[in-house]
Curated annotation (Swiss-Prot):
GO terms for cellular component: cytoplasm; endopeptidase Clp complex. It catalyses: Hydrolysis of proteins to small peptides in the presence of ATP and magnesium. alpha-casein is the usual test substrate. In the absence of ATP, only oligopeptides shorter than five residues are hydrolyzed (such as succinyl-Leu-Tyr-|-NHMec, and Leu-Tyr-Leu-|-Tyr-Trp, in which cleavage of the -Tyr-|-Leu- and -Tyr-|-Trp bonds also occurs). The gene is clpP. Pfam families: CLP_protease (PF00574). Its main location: cytoplasm. It comes from the Bacteria. This is ATP-dependent Clp protease proteolytic subunit. Fourteen ClpP subunits assemble into 2 heptameric rings which stack back to back to give a disk-like structure with a central cavity, resembling the structure of eukaryotic proteasomes. Keywords: Cytoplasm, Hydrolase, Protease, Serine protease. PANTHER family: ATP-DEPENDENT CLP PROTEASE PROTEOLYTIC SUBUNIT. The lineage of its organism: Bacteria, Pseudomonadati, Pseudomonadota, Betaproteobacteria, Neisseriales. Its EC number is 3.4.21.92. The keyword Transcription does not apply. InterPro entries: ClpP (IPR001907), ClpP/crotonase-like_dom_sf (IPR029045), ClpP/TepA (IPR023562), ClpP_His_AS (IPR033135), ClpP_Ser_AS (IPR018215). It comes from Neisseria meningitidis serogroup A / serotype 4A (strain DSM 15465 / Z2491). It is an enzyme of class 3 (hydrolase).
Length: 204
C-alpha cells in the first residue's frame, strides 16, 4: 500500500516521555487496523502480510481488523494474504469500504465467519480470474497456461463457496461474468455477515 502521491496526516501523541509523531496508518495499526487500498500487487500484499504477522506477534488472542477498498489484482499476491489470514492465530475481521472486487471480494469473504462487514454504499464484484497482460508463445505453452487458469478458477470458486455457504455450482454460474452486488446483496449471497450503518449497529 503506497501513499507516496498523497499527503499522509500525522498524529501527535503525548505521554510522560514527551511527544511522538505517527503517520495515520501507523497509528491505526496500533489499534490493529490493516488497510488494503488499491490493486492487489506483490508489494501491497507483502505489506499486508507483514502487518498481519506483526499484530499476531503483538497479541495472538486479539482480533485484527482488515479494511478493504480494492478493485482486485494478482491472484498469487492475494493468495499470500489469504493463506496468512488463515495461518495466524487471531481472528481477522474484514470490512469493505468503497469497493471489494475480484480478489478484493475473495479476501472480504475470507474473514472470520460472523465478522465480515460492509458499509452501506460499498460495491462488491465477483468474477472468474483473468489473464493479465498479453499471453503469447507457442501453442503448447498457451495450452499449459489455459489449464492452469482453469485450475485456479476451480480453486477460487471452491474456497469462496465454502466461505459463502453455497454450492460450487452457484459460484461457477455466478462468477462466469462480472457480477456486481450492493452491500445488502452481498450479505444475502453470503459474502459478508452484516451491513454496518454505523458503529452502534455492530453485532458480534
Amino acid at each position: 500500500m503506497s501513499f507516496d502521491n498523497y499527503l499522509v496526516p500525522t498524529v501527535i501523541e503525548q505521554s510522560g516521555r514527551g511527544e511522538r509523531a505517527f503517520d495515520i496508518y501507523s497509528r491505526l495499526l496500533k489499534e490493529r487496523i490493516v488497510f488494503l487500498v488499491g490493486p492487489v500487487t506483490d508489494e501491497s500484499a507483502n505489506l499486508v502480510v507483514a502487518q498481519l504477522l506483526f499484530l499476531e506477534s503483538e497479541n495472538p488472542d486479539k482480533d485484527i481488523f482488515f479494511y478493504i477498498n480494492s478493485p482486485g489484482g494478482s491472484v498469487t499476491a492475494g493468495m499470500s494474504i489469504y493463506d496468512t489470514m488463515n495461518f495466524i492465530k487471531p481472528d481477522v475481521s474484514t470490512l469493505c469500504l468503497g469497493q471489494a472486487a475480484s480478489m478484493g471480494a475473495f479476501l472480504l469473504s475470507a474473514g472470520e465467519k460472523g465478522k465480515r462487514f460492509a458499509l452501506p454504499n460499498s460495491r462488491i464484484m465477483i468474477h472468474q480470474p483473468l489473464i493479465s497482460g498479453g499471453l503469447g508463445g507457442q501453442a503448447s505453452d498457451i495450452e499449459i497456461h489455459a489449464r492452469e487458469l482453469l485450475k485456479i478458477k476451480e480453486k477460487l470458486n471452491r474456497l469462496m463457496a465454502k466461505h459463502c455457504g453455497r454450492d460450487l455450482a452457484d459460484l461457477e454460474r455466478d462468477t462466469d461474468r462480472d457480477n456486481f452486488m450492493s452491500a445488502e446483496e452481498a450479505k444475502e449471497y453470503g459474502l459478508i455477515d452484516q451491513v454496518l450503518e454505523n458503529r452502534a449497529s455492530l453485532q458480534l
